[in-house]
Amino acid sequence: MNKQSWLLNLSLLKTHPAFRAVFLARFISIVSLGLLGVAVPVQIQMMTHSTWQVGLSVTLTGGAMFVGLMVGGVLADRYERKKVILLARGTCGIGFIGLCLNALLPEPSLLAIYLLGLWDGFFASLGVTALLAATPALVGRENLMQAGAITMLTVRLGSVISPMIGGLLLATGGVAWNYGLAAAGTFITLLPLLSLPALPPPPQPREHPLKSLLAGFRFLLASPLVGGIALLGGLLTMASAVRVLYPALADNWQMSAAQIGFLYAAIPLGAAIGALTSGKLAHSVRPGLLMLLSTLGAFLAISLFGLMPMWILGVVCLALFGWLSAVSSLLQYTMLQTQTPEAMLGRINGLWTAQNVTGDAIGAALLGGLGAMMTPVASASASGFGLLIIGVLLLLVLVELRRFRQTPPQVTASDS
């Protein structure tokens, strides 16, 4: 009898050509967006010498992403999903070309950067929602956990590589190179995506887009299972906003500039380990309970993080948070895809991703407010323990999620 390994199985990339194409396109896209993420704040800072102006660009892009996720969810449930993905990627690339041309001007326009940031934020998130909605059809619902873990690794790897490349390009060629290569990378992603099969949405009655979006909201609120998953995801994202306290906590621990980097690397490293060791997660009989417990553990790790007497112990707490949050996120992703009707996948994925974006912004704002009234240590601990208390209450209240059981997929020779 074959025994399921703890390690992530990458065989999905070999057996499912469509998922392999998405994997390749996603990795190139993450690297391209990383080049953009380095260039935009640097260019605005050089032009204005104002951190407020840099923050404004991030806020505007985030707002456009939120709207794009909402619109993308409706479009993904009404139109052929492959066309939505290709349209979003191509249109996003046009925005990158605009940023490149603007950077080459003798006096680049700040307004153009803001407007193109809105453009790219909207269309980038539009494609994300359609791709999420199409994933079950590409890999089969029984392989969603494996696909989610591979995707998480892709995101983490790309997020590490792209800032390094972006920094080197800034040092050697300036921001125009970053924008130009980001545009080239985005158009290159169209090549593997063109090989995807047609991804039509399920047949459903035509209705006004706002009414369609409201139907998604109603489903989310009416379903204790799916609604509970989305709520946990938002709270977990709020906890990850603890990174806004890193500089202040680094002063408290008397860390050097080089050591501060370990704080920023700890959560992604823990999450990567969580994805790599997720081989048995799909075989959990009670994924809802495991999701709740891993989320509680993540909140506890954040609660203890700021209380550590040495920075290295704080890094361990952050890595533990990254690992537990990866476990919870993979379970959230898989259960959301399997428990949502096919006709609702676009809207529910859009709402789930949007609440993750919103949760991060709310968490950062709350921690900033606490930081004005408390010490950094007290702020980190108070936020963590507050979320832990809410998590315990949800463990008691979300009865359907806690008691949810599933039949584990059969282990085959190729899975072991």
UniProtKB/Swiss-Prot annotation:
- Fetch the InterPro entries from UniProt: Enterobactin_exp_EntS, MFS_dom, MFS_trans_sf, TM_effector
Keyword Cell cycle present in the record's keywords: the answer is no
Its localization reads: Cell inner membrane
Q: Name one GO molecular function term.
A: enterobactin transmembrane transporter activity
CDD domains associated with the record: MFS_MefA_like
UniProt-listed NCBIfam families = PRK10489.1
What name does the UniProt record give this protein? Enterobactin exporter EntS
What organism is this sequence from?
Escherichia coli O1:K1 / APEC
Source species taxonomy: Bacteria, Pseudomonadati, Pseudomonadota, Gammaproteobacteria, Enterobacterales
